[in-house]
Amino acid sequence: MNICFVGFGNIAQAIIGGLLKSGMSSENIACIERNQQKIALLKEKNLRMIQLENLASENFDLILLAVKPKDALRTEKDIFDSAPKSILITVVAGIALNKYSRPGSVIRSMPNTACAFGKGITGLYADDQKSHGFKNAIKLFSRTGYVLALENEGEMHRFTSIIGSGQAFLFQVLKVYLLELEKISFNDGNNLNDVFNHFVSSLGDSFAEEPDFENLINRIKSPGGTTQAGLESLENSELDKIFREAFEAAKNRSIEISNEQ
């Protein structure tokens, strides 16, 4: 499969990183980018650079649109002007298919940065999910992690807030945890990052063993104990409400981006 990325921002870099780690050859990946710093990074990674006007002659299986929302619709038109038969996957958040000039040839995707190490979760939506292009999109993102085909496009806003943005919300919580861990004095032989990484990986292992958060919490807390005191503090601070509002804010921003186009 030969693919081309139009734009080389964070999410494009994550996807490409995951594809290369999955065994895809760099010879099968091309990029279109104007930013000089990113061009230098492309050269460091030995990725092929092409020009937009050469798209048609390259005969790519998929073209991934990975530009800023404000540039997405103009760039999409330029792509189809250059290569009218293209199948385009957009990773741009918030912009509905009907905003594009050729929605029947566009597949919406919402990957997250965990694609870089094969642990990504990507949501896909297209009007025709039985098409060859959609099947190729599933094959492509399956190299970078787990793929979900959404039943309707409206779900993409919430998927964006939970999967696309949600990692950052949890990172914010873990950042607080790390700051608290740094207050403890360890012997020189103890590596703080190793301790933290061990803790974080244990969370996933615990859930794999027991996929019920209430049971996991009950295994740790005891009546009148330290965990109970901390949990009551979180409840008094309305932590659940804070997270729900964060997800809602991200979802609403996705809707706003769509309405701005």
Task: Label every model-predicted segment.
Residues 100-105, 121-158, 168-209, 253-257:
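Internal alpha-helical scaffold of NAD(P)-dependent oxidoreductase catalytic cores
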Residues 1-4:
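Extreme N-terminal starter segment of soluble prokaryotic enzymes
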Residues 29, 72, 187-195, 216, ...:
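Small-residue helix-packing motif on alpha-helices
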Residues 194-261:
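NAD(P)-dependent Rossmann-like dehydrogenase/reductase catalytic/cofactor-binding core
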Residues 8-9:
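Glycine-rich Rossmann-fold phosphate-binding loop(s) that bind the pyrophosphate
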Residues 16, 30, 36-39, 45, ...:
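Rossmann-like NAD(P)(H) cofactor-binding subdomain of soluble oxidoreductases
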Residues 12-13:
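N-terminal Rossmann-fold NAD(P) dinucleotide-binding loop
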